[in-house]
From Swiss-Prot:
Its cofactor is Mg(2+). It is an enzyme of class 2 (transferase). NCBIfam families: PRK09355.1. Keywords: ATP-binding, Kinase, Magnesium, Metal-binding, Nucleotide-binding, Thiamine biosynthesis, Transferase. The gene is thiM. Its EC number is 2.7.1.50. This is Hydroxyethylthiazole kinase. It catalyses: 5-(2-hydroxyethyl)-4-methylthiazole + ATP = 4-methyl-5-(2-phosphooxyethyl)-thiazole + ADP + H(+). It comes from Exiguobacterium sibiricum (strain DSM 17290 / CCUG 55495 / CIP 109462 / JCM 13490 / 255-15). Gene3D superfamilies: 3.40.1190.20. Pathway: Cofactor biosynthesis; thiamine diphosphate biosynthesis; 4-methyl-5-(2-phosphoethyl)-thiazole from 5-(2-hydroxyethyl)-4-methylthiazole: step 1/1. One of its GO terms (biological process) is thiamine biosynthetic process. ATP binds at K113, T159. It comes from the Bacteria.
Length: 256
């Protein structure tokens, strides 16, 4: 059990996609947080005011969701609440690319987490996508990510075979996880929920990004010997729910 999180039980407001919303809620609970998924424009500002952190996930956007996400992000900025962007599908269509530009122009994010294709799109670089998934063979210059984080004062997480986290000053590589994480939809979305839960419990933004990303990778390794995809997915929740404080110094001591 992660005592700091369980003691506070941070409220994490998700404006997320309909494909993985239940998994994001359960992963937040597994780590010790409390999820809420309020999308109505009439209550978004009030809910952000109650929340300890906000997640904006663009997986299944529509006109109302786009308005709600913009309002939630701006409200979080005004109130000084951490806000995480998971730019799912960035670069896949003109609509998504244009909306990402609007989000980046109008909201300052605490942490941005995405795969190589999504982050390249946010950096204004040409990217190849396959729906909401990263295209095979897609590569990204990590120094450009580091520079972007420094310029925007936002923590950037690039997920992949080796995850990369930078705040523009520090950078951290996480060689943890399993290919099986790519066989279950929503593991990236759940990673954003984990990062938000650490943020909501008062961890620093760089540490929260590293710890949340590490937690998903480590859970994948722990559940990796389960025979089927269904039991593997369940094992992810089990592994996160059983994590303790002792696992976190291991992340802190890794080379940066």
């Amino acid at each position: 059990m992660l005592r700091r999180i369980h003691d506070k039980k941070p409220l994490i407001h998700h404006l997320t996609n309909t494909v993985t919303i239940n998994d994001c809620a359960n992963m937040t609970l597994a780590l010790g947080g409390s999820p809420v998924m309020a999308e109505d424009l009439l209550e978004v500002e009030e809910m952000v005011g109650l929340a300890d952190a906000v997640v904006i996930n663009t997986g299944t956007i529509n006109p109302d969701m786009r308005k709600a996400q913009l309002l939630a992000g701006k409200t979080a900025n005004r109130l000084g609440k951490p806000v995480i962007l998971d730019p799912v599908g960035a670069g896949a269509t003109t609509l998504r690319t244009d909306f990402m530009k609007q989000l980046m122009e109008e909201i300052t994010f605490t942490v941005i987490k995405g795969n190589a294709s999504e982050i390249k799109t946010l950096l204004g670089q040409a990217a190849r996508t396959k729906g909401v998934d990263v295209a095979e063979g897609e590569s990204l210059d990590l120094q450009s990510v580091h520079a972007f984080a420094s310029q925007t004062k936002q923590v950037i997480v690039v997920t992949g075979p080796v995850d990369f986290v930078t705040d523009g000053v520090r950078q951290h590589h996480l060689d943890v996880g399993t290919k099986r994480l790519g066989q279950v939809t929503g593991t990236g979305c759940m990673t954003a929920s984990l990062i938000a839960t650490f943020l909501g419990a008062g961890y620093g933004r760089f540490d929260a990004a590293v710890f949340g990303t590490y937690a998903m990778g480590k859970a994948g390794e722990t559940a990796g010997n389960r025979p089927g995809i269904g039991s593997f997915r369940t094992g992810l929740f089990d592994a996160v729910s059983l994590m303790t404080e002792e696992s976190l110094p291991e992340v802190q001591m890794n080379g940066q």
